[in-house]
Amino acid sequence: MYFTLLVVVILTAIALVAVALGIARAISPRSYNSQKGEAYECGIPTRGRSWMQFKVGYYLFAILFLMFDVETVFLFPWAVVVQDLGVYGLFSILFFLVILVLGLAYAWKKGALEWK
Protein backbone atom coordinates (compact mmCIF):
# COMPACT_ATOMS: atom_id res chain seq x y z
CA MET A 1 0.00 0.00 0.00
CA TYR A 2 2.68 2.51 0.99
CA PHE A 3 5.01 1.31 -1.74
CA THR A 4 2.42 2.18 -4.39
CA LEU A 5 1.97 5.61 -2.84
CA LEU A 6 5.74 6.12 -2.78
CA VAL A 7 6.04 5.18 -6.46
CA VAL A 8 3.20 7.54 -7.39
CA VAL A 9 4.77 10.42 -5.43
CA ILE A 10 8.19 9.85 -6.99
CA LEU A 11 6.77 9.62 -10.52
CA THR A 12 4.69 12.75 -9.94
CA ALA A 13 7.76 14.63 -8.72
CA ILE A 14 9.79 13.51 -11.74
CA ALA A 15 6.96 14.50 -14.08
CA LEU A 16 6.61 17.95 -12.49
CA VAL A 17 10.34 18.59 -12.76
CA ALA A 18 10.36 17.43 -16.39
CA VAL A 19 7.39 19.65 -17.25
CA ALA A 20 8.96 22.67 -15.52
CA LEU A 21 12.27 22.18 -17.33
CA GLY A 22 10.50 21.65 -20.64
CA ILE A 23 8.43 24.81 -20.28
CA ALA A 24 11.50 26.83 -19.26
CA ARG A 25 13.42 25.56 -22.27
CA ALA A 26 10.52 26.23 -24.63
CA ILE A 27 9.85 29.82 -23.59
CA SER A 28 13.37 31.00 -22.72
CA PRO A 29 14.98 33.49 -25.09
CA ARG A 30 17.98 32.25 -27.02
CA SER A 31 20.81 34.55 -27.96
CA TYR A 32 24.16 33.21 -28.98
CA ASN A 33 27.15 35.52 -29.20
CA SER A 34 30.87 35.36 -28.54
CA GLN A 35 30.65 37.00 -25.13
CA LYS A 36 28.18 34.46 -23.80
CA GLY A 37 30.78 31.70 -23.82
CA GLU A 38 33.49 33.70 -22.07
CA ALA A 39 34.44 32.84 -18.53
CA TYR A 40 34.49 35.65 -16.00
CA GLU A 41 35.26 36.12 -12.36
CA CYS A 42 33.48 38.90 -10.48
CA GLY A 43 32.98 40.86 -13.71
CA ILE A 44 36.71 41.06 -14.41
CA PRO A 45 37.81 39.71 -17.80
CA THR A 46 40.09 36.71 -17.60
CA ARG A 47 43.76 36.97 -18.43
CA GLY A 48 45.54 33.97 -19.84
CA ARG A 49 43.97 30.55 -19.92
CA SER A 50 40.59 30.27 -18.28
CA TRP A 51 41.11 26.61 -17.34
CA MET A 52 43.72 26.35 -14.63
CA GLN A 53 44.82 23.34 -12.67
CA PHE A 54 44.54 23.49 -8.90
CA LYS A 55 46.75 21.56 -6.58
CA VAL A 56 45.14 18.61 -4.87
CA GLY A 57 46.26 20.05 -1.55
CA TYR A 58 43.40 22.54 -1.63
CA TYR A 59 40.85 19.77 -1.93
CA LEU A 60 42.54 17.71 0.77
CA PHE A 61 42.48 20.61 3.21
CA ALA A 62 38.84 21.29 2.32
CA ILE A 63 37.87 17.68 3.01
CA LEU A 64 39.74 17.68 6.32
CA PHE A 65 38.08 20.97 7.26
CA LEU A 66 34.65 19.53 6.48
CA MET A 67 35.40 16.44 8.53
CA PHE A 68 36.25 18.47 11.62
CA ASP A 69 33.43 20.91 10.97
CA VAL A 70 30.97 18.02 11.01
CA GLU A 71 32.59 16.88 14.26
CA THR A 72 31.73 20.25 15.77
CA VAL A 73 28.15 19.95 14.54
CA PHE A 74 27.88 16.65 16.44
CA LEU A 75 29.66 17.88 19.58
CA PHE A 76 27.52 20.94 20.29
CA PRO A 77 24.17 19.11 20.63
CA TRP A 78 25.89 16.39 22.64
CA ALA A 79 27.29 18.99 25.04
CA VAL A 80 23.81 20.38 25.61
CA VAL A 81 22.28 17.03 26.64
CA VAL A 82 25.36 15.32 28.13
CA GLN A 83 23.83 15.02 31.61
CA ASP A 84 20.68 13.32 30.31
CA LEU A 85 22.58 10.73 28.24
CA GLY A 86 24.43 9.05 31.06
CA VAL A 87 27.25 6.57 30.59
CA TYR A 88 26.01 5.37 27.19
CA GLY A 89 26.17 8.91 25.81
CA LEU A 90 29.65 9.41 27.23
CA PHE A 91 31.00 6.22 25.68
CA SER A 92 29.32 6.87 22.34
CA ILE A 93 30.90 10.33 22.01
CA LEU A 94 34.25 8.99 23.20
CA PHE A 95 34.06 6.32 20.50
CA PHE A 96 33.25 9.02 17.95
CA LEU A 97 36.18 11.16 19.09
CA VAL A 98 38.59 8.20 19.09
CA ILE A 99 37.66 7.43 15.47
CA LEU A 100 38.16 11.09 14.59
CA VAL A 101 41.54 11.29 16.33
CA LEU A 102 42.64 8.09 14.59
CA GLY A 103 41.65 9.66 11.27
CA LEU A 104 43.62 12.79 12.10
CA ALA A 105 46.65 10.71 13.11
CA TYR A 106 46.41 8.76 9.86
CA ALA A 107 46.20 11.96 7.80
CA TRP A 108 49.14 13.40 9.71
CA LYS A 109 51.20 10.22 9.22
CA LYS A 110 50.47 10.19 5.48
CA GLY A 111 51.60 13.82 5.19
CA ALA A 112 48.19 15.20 4.28
CA LEU A 113 48.67 18.15 6.62
CA GLU A 114 51.97 19.23 5.09
CA TRP A 115 51.81 21.82 2.34
CA LYS A 116 54.08 20.77 -0.51
Curated annotation (Swiss-Prot):
<keyword id="KW-0472">Membrane</keyword>
<comment type="similarity">
    <text>Belongs to the complex I subunit 3 family.</text>
</comment>
<dbReference type="GO" id="GO:0030964">
    <property type="term" value="C:NADH dehydrogenase complex"/>
</dbReference>
<dbReference type="GO" id="GO:0008137">
    <property type="term" value="F:NADH dehydrogenase (ubiquinone) activity"/>
</dbReference>
<keyword id="KW-0874">Quinone</keyword>
<keyword id="KW-0520">NAD</keyword>
<dbReference type="GO" id="GO:0005886">
    <property type="term" value="C:plasma membrane"/>
</dbReference>
<protein>
    <recommendedName>
        <fullName>NADH-quinone oxidoreductase subunit A</fullName>
        <ecNumber>7.1.1.-</ecNumber>
    </recommendedName>
</protein>
<feature type="transmembrane region" description="Helical">
    <location>
        <begin position="85"/>
        <end position="105"/>
    </location>
</feature>
<dbReference type="Pfam" id="PF00507">
    <property type="entry name" value="Oxidored_q4"/>
</dbReference>
<feature type="transmembrane region" description="Helical">
    <location>
        <begin position="3"/>
        <end position="23"/>
    </location>
</feature>
<keyword id="KW-1003">Cell membrane</keyword>
<dbReference type="InterPro" id="IPR023043">
    <property type="entry name" value="NAD(P)H_OxRDtase_bac/plastid"/>
</dbReference>
<dbReference type="InterPro" id="IPR038430">
    <property type="entry name" value="NDAH_ubi_oxred_su3_sf"/>
</dbReference>
<keyword id="KW-0812">Transmembrane</keyword>
<dbReference type="InterPro" id="IPR000440">
    <property type="entry name" value="NADH_UbQ/plastoQ_OxRdtase_su3"/>
</dbReference>
<keyword id="KW-1133">Transmembrane helix</keyword>
<comment type="subunit">
    <text>NDH-1 is composed of 14 different subunits. Subunits NuoA, H, J, K, L, M, N constitute the membrane sector of the complex.</text>
</comment>
<dbReference type="GO" id="GO:0048038">
    <property type="term" value="F:quinone binding"/>
</dbReference>
<keyword id="KW-1278">Translocase</keyword>
<keyword id="KW-0997">Cell inner membrane</keyword>
<comment type="function">
    <text>NDH-1 shuttles electrons from NADH, via FMN and iron-sulfur (Fe-S) centers, to quinones in the respiratory chain. The immediate electron acceptor for the enzyme in this species is believed to be a menaquinone. Couples the redox reaction to proton translocation (for every two electrons transferred, four hydrogen ions are translocated across the cytoplasmic membrane), and thus conserves the redox energy in a proton gradient.</text>
</comment>
<feature type="transmembrane region" description="Helical">
    <location>
        <begin position="61"/>
        <end position="81"/>
    </location>
</feature>
<dbReference type="GO" id="GO:0050136">
    <property type="term" value="F:NADH:ubiquinone reductase (non-electrogenic) activity"/>
</dbReference>
<keyword id="KW-0813">Transport</keyword>
